[in-house]
Swiss-Prot record:
It comes from Synechococcus sp. (strain WH7803). GO terms for molecular function: rRNA binding; structural constituent of ribosome. GO terms for biological process: translation. Keywords: Ribonucleoprotein, Ribosomal protein, RNA-binding, rRNA-binding. GO terms for cellular component: ribonucleoprotein complex; ribosome. This is Large ribosomal subunit protein uL4. InterPro entries: Ribosomal_uL4, Ribosomal_uL4-like, Ribosomal_uL4_dom_sf. Part of the 50S ribosomal subunit.
Length: 211
């Protein structure tokens, strides 16, 4: 179990919150998270790269010159892979790069990643709920009050981010805002600082705490 300090929008301490999640064994945790990240990145690949083999390249049906008597190397087609404009040997073809991983393993990897970064987590009550209009400066100032620089990699996880909040954050290149149900291993490990809304923390505990 980990205890986190809860702060308000002004950065003042308002209480404490706990997070109790089962994690992987120390001997297998690194491999588990690594496989989860590889799977996540593999699933983002379109897999549409495609090349033409010598049989698919247009032309090349006629033998370019006779077999003997020219002093040159024998050629059967101008579309041989040995010539410019020829086919590609063992080039990529459209395929799926998806990797399989059990649901229990995926959930365990996410819990392990979150608990591994618990020292970098800042829990905030009512993050950005007072914003009436999109204002990037308000987000930068709020992060500053929490001791977090907006030009570092920051992951903000909220229960249900409002449109005003999304528009306020989108101008910050290194700040990413996601909902609690979009939590993933890569973002957890990639960020330098994590900001969790109090309601998001409760959602995470409810969804992942029973395993």
């Amino acid at each position: 179990m980990a205890n986190c300090v809860v702060r308000d929008w002004q950065g003042k301490e308002t209480g404490k919150a706990s997070l109790d999640l089962k994690v992987a064994k120390e001997t297998t945790a690194l491999d588990l998270m690594h496989r989860a990240v590889l799977r996540q990145q593999a699933h983002t690949r379109q897999g549409t790269a495609s090349t033409l083999t010598r049989s698919e390249v247009r032309g090349g049906g006629r033998k370019p010159y006779k077999q003997k008597g020219t002093g040159r190397a024998r050629q059967g087609s101008i579309r041989t892979p040995l010539r410019p404009g020829g086919g590609i040997v063992f080039g990529p073809k459209p395929r799926s790069y998806n990797l399989a991983m059990n649901r229990k393993e995926r959930r365990l990897a996410l819990r392990t990643a979150l608990m591994a970064r618990i020292d970098d987590v800042t829990v905030v009550k009512d993050f950005g709920t007072s914003l009436e209009a999109p204002k990037t400066r308000e987000i930068v100032d709020a992060l500053g009050r929490l001791g977090i620089e907006a030009d570092s990699k920051v992951l903000i996880v909220l229960g249900t981010p409002s449109e005003v909040l999304r528009r306020s954050v989108r101008n910050l290149e290194k700040v990413k805002l996601i909902a609690a149900n979009q939590l993933n291993v890569f973002d957890l490990l990639h960020a330098n600082a994590l900001v969790l809304g109090e309601e998001a923390l409760a959602t995470i505990q409810e969804v992942y705490g029973d395993d």
